[in-house]
Regions:
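Glycine-rich Rossmann NAD(P)(H)-binding loop
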Residues: 172, 203-211, 238-245, 256
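Conserved Rossmann-fold NAD(P)-dependent oxidoreductase catalytic core, especially the SDR/UDP-sugar
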Residues: 67, 87-143
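A conserved pocket-lining segment of Rossmann-fold NAD(P)-dependent short-chain dehydrogenase/reductase
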Residues: 187-215
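Glycine/proline-rich active-site loop of Rossmann-fold NAD(P)-dependent oxidoreductases
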Residues: 158, 172-188, 218, 226-238, ...
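N-terminal Rossmann NAD(P)H-binding glycine-rich loop of SDR-like oxidoreductase domains
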Residues: 3-25
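Mid/C-terminal beta-alpha module of Rossmann-like enzyme folds, strongest
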Residues: 221-282
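NAD(P)H-binding glycine-rich loop region in Rossmannoid oxidoreductase-like domains
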Residues: 37-38, 46-91
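Active-site Tyr-X1-5-Lys
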Residues: 134-168, 173
């Protein structure tokens, strides 16, 4: 049987990398996004996940065997994050029910599973590190948990297997997608080089000195494909990172060197929203 993938969020960093990988490996790939993915081998589908009727209409005739949920929508509060993002997962999994072909659904979440939502990110007592997949949930409301609950309920109802993938900060190539730390830092460094401004670290003292890691979109795509096609990986959660642990105080000077500029010493908070407030014309 030919594997038919439905990649939700196909124009994003993760979704576009995954769509290309699956198409290259001979999968039939449908890419769902508000801004359709036009890569070779990907059938574009334009739909809004919060509109159940329009979503069902857009998916008419699509019979996915494997679904990859790689998108989310940030809202003004965690309560809204929970409501909106849970509804997006619920609507999608309801829309594919009539086809009756789904065998596996993969959900991409992330580090906030362990550190808490935006409103409480990294505050209070942190869980034991390194983070392990079997660690229990934090005692806070979290839209990642709401997404998981929708996935688990649908899997029990419809009989498909699932996997949850928890990357750290994801970097990769996605044309037109601004939610990409690599692109953001490249633009910021380029502006600093153009204007002669100091290349200041925009994060906190804790971030500067703490160990961290990242996830390459290609690495995550390969992991998603593996989990979706490996029976032993069914019904499990996975942390997915590159494995090269670093500190920003070490990395910052290396980014500066790449762009031919000097790295400024850490001198307190310097949010990019403030540093780049007047840079629209550059």
């Amino acid at each position: 049987m030919t594997n038919q993938a439905l990649v939700v969020g196909a124009s994003g960093i993760v979704g576009s990398a995954l769509s290309r990988l699956l198409a290259d490996e001979g999968w039939k790939v449908a890419g769902l996004a508000r801004r359709p993915n036009t890569d070779a081998g990907v059938t574009p589908i334009s739909a809004v996940l919060l509109d159940p009727k329009a979503l069902a209409a857009a998916l008419t005739g699509v019979s996915p065997t494997h679904i990859f949920l790689t998108t989310w929508a940030r809202q003004a509060s965690e309560a809204e994050n929970i409501r909106v993002n849970a509804q997006m997962v619920r609507n999608l999994l309801e829309a594919v029910r009539p086809a009756g072909a789904v065998r596996h659904v993969a959900l991409v979440t992330g580090l906030k599973h362990y550190l808490g939502p935006f409103e409480a990110y990294g505050k209070g007592a942190l869980p034991q590190t390194p983070f392990r997949e079997e660690q229990g949930r934090l005692d806070v409301e979290n839209f990642y948990y709401a997404q998981e609950d929708e996935l688990f309920a649908a899997a029990e109802r419809d009989g498909f297997s699932w996997s949850v993938h928890r990357p750290h900060t994801v970097t990769g190539v996605a044309v037109g997608n601004a939610m990409n730390m690599a692109t953001t830092l490249a633009v910021y460094a380029s502006i600093c080089r153009h204007t002669g401004r100091p290349f200041r670290f925009p994060g906190s003292d804790v971030q500067w000195h703490s160990l961290t890691d990242m996830t390459d979109a290609g690495q995550l795509a390969r992991h998603l494909r593996w989990a979706a096609s490996t029976p032993a990986a069914a019904n499990q959660a996975f942390n997915v990172v590159n494995g090269d642990v670093f500190r920003w105080k070490w990395m910052w000077s290396r980014i500066a060197e790449w762009f031919g500029i000097d790295a400024a010493p850490l001198d307190g908070p310097a949010p990019l929203e403030q540093q780049m407030a007047g840079d629209a014309d550059i």
